Amino acid sequence: MQLEDTIAAIATAIVPQQGSIGVVRLSGPQSLTIAKTLFDAPGNQTWESHRILYGHVRHPQTKAAIDEALLLLMLAPRSYTKEDVVEFQCHGGIMPVQQVLQLCLQQGARLAQPGEFSFRAFLNGRLDLTQAESISELVGAQSPQAAAIALAGLQGKLAQPIRDLRNTCLDILAEVEARIDFEDDLPPLDEDSIRQQLQNLYQQLEDILNTAQRGELLRTGLKVAIVGQPNVGKSSLLNAWSRTDRAIVTDLPGTTRDVVESQLVVEGIPIQVLDTAGIRETADQVEQIGVERSRKAAQQADLVLLTVDAHQGWTEADQLIYEQVKDRPLILVINKIDLGRADLVSYPPEITNTVLTAAAANLGIEALENAIIEQVNQTNLSPQNLDFAINQRQEAVLTEAQLALKQLQQTMAEQLPLDFWTIDLRLAINALGQVTGETVTESVLDRIFSRFCIGK
């Protein structure tokens, strides 16, 4: 990336005929010059930082009006990137913003690369790496709780404890190196104190690492597969739960031929519900493909809803399906209780989590949601009461830091020379710095920011 360039991009989603406002963003040394060339602000409006001007975007040669717009000025260093930033706030839709963007490019700006605005904010000290990653997570949040966790990261609630840990490691390193360089002039190291500090550091890292899986649940959601025989009401269950007609419902077995997905949020947890084809032996090649996809979906799901028909009871076919999914976290859904007696369904005694539903009548959905949340809580994955959560990249480097501290404890126990202590400490310090971006490599930065949208 050429950071001395002025960059431009559309910063809002382009939705044909639907967007009410479209924003074109500029950042860099020529932002203000380009804005003054293209924007006609009538009257005595003041071109000062953090002002909004009203006027028209005009073609620089023909002076033809392109759009009636507002212009927001945020000059360095009081801007998102700490550079001169200008935003054209145009009417929504495709044509106005694309025309304005094209004019900006013709005046010397270049099209921003994905995440380049945030990358500049990071390089200029406006954001650390945890905050930059939190912006991406906030944009992609699938639930209010996921958004709250991302916002906590943006506010520095993850970065601060990581910095505190790193500073403690730096303090210990300084003490050790001082004893190496000035052994005769300083008292011996207080090894008991260092051991206690290392134990505290290790436990704090363990607490932070314990947020990883819970945070991942908020980011990616819980994958729930509805499985069972044909015509036990799986599609009706999906429709009742999602309050839509996502799946076709008929009295004919085998109607569902493929996996039907629906996105839900239950108590702040995003849930991806998979309505699968009825599992049975069939000569129909298309249905066979659907059945195989059902088996695969069940094996990849975080939770399986094994659905049976209360009217039919527990059948040999139900037992065969159960044998295929019993190694997965499972809830038995006894459906169609309005047509049969649930107490007559003789399911295996090891199944302890059951829910009674009549999906066609919208009965039992709340009980099903409660059972799912209870299942999540039992696995210690509940995202409730999280102050922040780390992502997979952060988990990997924090694990490296923890391993380095553990190695240092072993190094001390073996009474190895102080030079060996510094090796372990530097590994821990480097890993902690990768979380906030103080020691991160260019390739890692490229990978992180390439996942952003262009206008970010």
Curated annotation (Swiss-Prot):
InterPro entries: G_TrmE, GTP-bd, GTP-bd_TrmE_N, GTPase_MnmE, MnmE_dom2, MnmE_helical, P-loop_NTPase, Small_GTP-bd. It is an enzyme of class 3 (hydrolase). PROSITE patterns: G_TRME. It is found in: Cytoplasm. Binds 1 potassium ion per subunit. K(+) binds at residues 231, 250, 252, 255. Residues 221-377 form the TrmE-type G domain. The keyword Hydrolase applies. SUPFAM superfamilies: P-loop containing nucleoside triphosphate hydrolases, TrmE connector domain. Keywords: Cytoplasm, GTP-binding, Hydrolase, Magnesium, Metal-binding, Nucleotide-binding, Potassium, tRNA processing. (6S)-5-formyl-5,6,7,8-tetrahydrofolate binds at residues 25, 87, 126, 456. Its cofactor is K(+). Mg(2+) binds at residues 235, 256. GO terms for molecular function: GTP binding; GTPase activity; metal ion binding. Its main location: cytoplasm. GTP binds at residues 231-236, 250-256, 275-278. GO terms for biological process: tRNA methylation; tRNA wobble uridine modification. One of its GO terms (cellular component) is cytoplasm. Its EC number is 3.6.-.-. The keyword GTP-binding applies. Homodimer. Heterotetramer of two MnmE and two MnmG subunits. Belongs to the TRAFAC class TrmE-Era-EngA-EngB-Septin-like GTPase superfamily. TrmE GTPase family. PANTHER family: TRNA MODIFICATION GTPASE GTPBP3 (PTHR42714), TRNA MODIFICATION GTPASE GTPBP3, MITOCHONDRIAL (PTHR42714:SF2). Exhibits a very high intrinsic GTPase hydrolysis rate. Involved in the addition of a carboxymethylaminomethyl (cmnm) group at the wobble position (U34) of certain tRNAs, forming tRNA-cmnm(5)s(2)U34. This is tRNA modification GTPase MnmE. It comes from Synechocystis sp. (strain ATCC 27184 / PCC 6803 / Kazusa). The lineage of its organism: Bacteria, Bacillati, Cyanobacteriota, Cyanophyceae, Synechococcales. The gene is mnmE.
